[in-house]
UniProtKB/Swiss-Prot annotation:
Known catalytic reactions: 2'-phospho-[ligated tRNA] + NAD(+) = mature tRNA + ADP-alpha-D-ribose 1'',2''-cyclic phosphate + nicotinamide
Family the UniProt entry places it in: Belongs to the KptA/TPT1 family.
Protein EC: 2.7.1.160
InterPro entries listed in its UniProt record: Ptrans_KptA/Tpt1, RNA_2'-PTrans_C, RNA_2'-PTrans_N
Enzyme class per UniProt: transferase
Miscellaneous information on this protein: Present with 672 molecules/cell in log phase SD medium.
Species annotation: Saccharomyces cerevisiae (strain ATCC 204508 / S288c)
The protein's role, per its UniProt record: Catalyzes the last step of tRNA splicing, the transfer of the splice junction 2'-phosphate from ligated tRNA to NAD to produce ADP-ribose 1''-2'' cyclic phosphate.
Keyword NAD part of the UniProt annotation: yes
Entry protein name: tRNA 2'-phosphotransferase
Signal peptide: none
């Protein structure tokens, strides 16, 4: 049992190291990375962040296969040259993925029934007040095709999210305003989303900060955006 726990802990550490390098710092760390976000696996394994954990090719294969959010993808070039990428979440500006890794969404028939941005109480207030859901330091806004743990929903929001912003996929403004893509792990990625495309805001659980809740109620009411609790 103890060995299993240690293995799980090590896999979490390796997954975090992979995310850090592939999403954010590959260029800074002078790793080869192409415009789709792929890095040679052998080169990645030589980096100190992975060498510290004595990471092997088998470790990487296991993490890619078993990661519950399918954060990583491996492709093979030639006979045995493997390259790995993070499926989304990048802040590296030189990454401009082709439709090999990001499928352009250009018509309503390509959209799921729901598109939801998961966040928290403090952040949703900032979003409404600023007028848009912004990618912040990342390249895209992340959207999930449903609530956490719903059928077919792998990723797209943090498990700690307790506020859900539903996007109006049927608005005439949707394709006029947004550039939308779908990632390899079925996360929908967008440019900045104006609040005019917010269909409703749903708060989950019993949030105790009544002052912030009152602020949220007020600013949503001012913009005619419904607020629901579940």
């Amino acid at each position: 049992m103890r060995q299993v726990l240690q293995k799980d802990k090590r896999d979490v550490q390796l997954s975090k190291a992979l995310s850090y390098l592939l999403r954010h710092t590959a260029v800074k760390e002078k790793l080869t990375i192409d415009s789709n976000g792929y890095t040679p696996l052998k080169e990645l394994l030589s980096h100190n962040r992975l060498k510290t954990h004595k990471c092997t090719v088998d470790d990487i294969h296991r993490i890619v296969k078993e990661n519950d959010k399918q954060r990583f993808h491996i492709k093979t070039l030639g006979a045995d040259e493997e390259w790995i990428c993070a499926t989304q979440g990048h802040s590296i500006k030189s990454i401009q993925p082709s439709d090999e890794v990001l499928v352009p969404i250009t018509e309503a028939s390509q959209l799921p029934q729901e598109l939801i941005h998961g966040t928290n109480l403090q952040s949703v207030i900032k979003i409404i007040e600023s007028g848009a859901i912004s990618p912040m330091s990342r390249n895209h806004v992340h959207l999930s095709p449903g609530m956490l743990h719903a059928k077919g929903v792998i990723s797209g929001m943090r498990s700690s999210s307790n506020v859900y912003i539903f996007i109006d996929c049927h608005s005439p403004l949707f394709f006029q305003t947004l550039k939308m893509f779908r990632s390899l792990n079925n996360v929908y990625l967008s440019s900045s989303i104006p609040v005019e495309l917010i269909q409703k805001v749903v708060v989950k659980g019993n949030l105790k900060d009544e002052e912030k809740l009152d602020t949220l109620r007020r600013i949503l009411h001012e913009r005619n955006i419904p607020l629901e609790k579940i």
